[in-house]
Every structure is written in C-alpha cells, then in structure tokens.
C-alpha cells in the first residue's frame, strides 16, 4: 500500500511538472494533472494539500535536480580554482539542455514575482552550498594569487546561472530576430566560452 502511495505521489509530481511548465501556476489545472497522473483530484489534495503546495513541491523538485548537479561538483577536488568555474558552466548548460521544464517553471515563477519561492523559507537556503563552494574557491584563488581581492562570490554565482539560463530562456525569440540556430554545437560552444571567459576576467587579479 505504501509503495502504491509513493508511486501515485511520484506520478502526480511528474504530471504537475509538465502542467506547470506548460501553463504556469495560474493556467495549470488540477483536473489535467489528475488525468495525466491517472488518479482523481482528491488524491492530489490528500498528498499535497493544495494546488499552491503542489506548485511549491514542483519548484522544490526542480531546484533539487540542479542542486544534485552542484553537489557532485562540490564533492570533486579541483587543483586549479578556475577549473571549477569552467566545470560549473559546462554542467549548468548540460542540465538545462536535459531539463527544459526547469527553464519554463523558473520563467513562470519570475513572472509570478517569486511568490511561491518567497512564501517558503526552505528555498532561501537552496543555493547556500554552491555559494559557499564558490566563496571558498575565490578565497583559494586569492591565496595562490590568481583571483582579485574584490571578487564577490554571489556575483560569480549569479553570472554562472544567468549566463547559462538566458541561452535557454531566449531560445524561441532570439533565433528569429538574429537568424541563428541555438541547437548548433559550434554556437553553443562559443556562448559557453564567452560565459567562462567573462567570469574568469572578472575574477582575474
């Protein structure tokens, strides 16, 4: 019975990810989530309490996926501080390529002025591990004389995230306006190098 309950919760969450990614919080329908999950609406409210709480669980799930990538990077030992920066850029891009729903959900939440994120205190700590890792990396870079003293760790994290995220959040409009193909590997590689070199330039002593 417990196994079935966990399976149902998982099916609901997966269906909710797709529905909220496609329609945002306001446009998403619990009926559609229930149909896609193969359950009734009552089970959604039983397991998640409300549409709002289900939406928060979806955001938490998406952030947890990214956090697992960050945790793997944090666990690795980089002898060169700049190598970590390059590795994070590469993994962020890889993650966003594989998880288009993440981009859509975060875009919707930004349009919603981060109401769900602000209402749940647990989200405040979601970036703490990677910020601390970058802070230590910047400090180590200063100690060996390759990073400047004024470098701000949060600025670096912001640049890492937005440098990758903007590539995918603009993937429909900018290709039309600039006549470019964002799926071309050479274009993707060039953009990643711009992000990496820009952050390295900011950090350079």
Which residues does each PLM region occupy?
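Amphipathic alpha-helical segments used for helix-helix packing
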Residues: 97-118, 170-178
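N-terminal intrinsically disordered/low-complexity leader segments
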Residues: 1-7
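Hydrophobic alpha-helical connector segments
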Residues: 72-102, 153-160, 205
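Helix-turn-helix
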Residues: 11, 15, 19-53, 57-58
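C-terminal peripheral helix-coil segments that are non-catalytic and often amphipathic
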Residues: 91-94, 98, 128-144, 159-205
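Short, basic, alpha-helical segments at the C-terminal edge of helix-turn-helix-like DNA-binding modules
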Residues: 60-65
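All-alpha amphipathic helical-bundle segments outside canonical DNA-binding/catalytic cores
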Residues: 122-126, 143-159
């Amino acid at each position: 019975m417990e196994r079935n309950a966990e399976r149902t919760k998982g099916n609901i969450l997966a269906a909710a990810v797709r529905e909220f990614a496609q329609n945002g919080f306001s446009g998403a329908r619990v009926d559609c989530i229930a149909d896609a999950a193969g359950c009734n609406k009552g089970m959604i409210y039983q397991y998640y309490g409300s549409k709002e709480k289900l939406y928060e669980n979806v955001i938490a799930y998406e952030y947890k996926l990214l956090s697992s990538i960050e945790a793997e990077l944090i666990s690795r030992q980089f002898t060169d501080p700049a190598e970590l920066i390059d590795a994070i850029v590469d993994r962020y891009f890889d993650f966003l390529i594989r998880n288009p729903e993440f981009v859509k959900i975060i875009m919707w939440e930004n349009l919603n002025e981060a109401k769900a994120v602000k209402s749940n205190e647990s989200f405040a700590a979601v970036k703490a591990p990677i910020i601390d890792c970058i802070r230590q990396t910047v400090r180590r870079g200063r100690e060996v004389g390759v990073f400047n003293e004024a470098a701000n760790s949060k600025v670096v994290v912001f640049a890492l995230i937005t440098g990758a995220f903007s590539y995918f959040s603009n993937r429909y409009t900018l290709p039309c306006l600039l006549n470019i193909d964002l799926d071309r590997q050479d274009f993707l590689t060039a953009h990643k190098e711009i992000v990496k070199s820009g952050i390295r330039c900011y950090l350079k002593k």
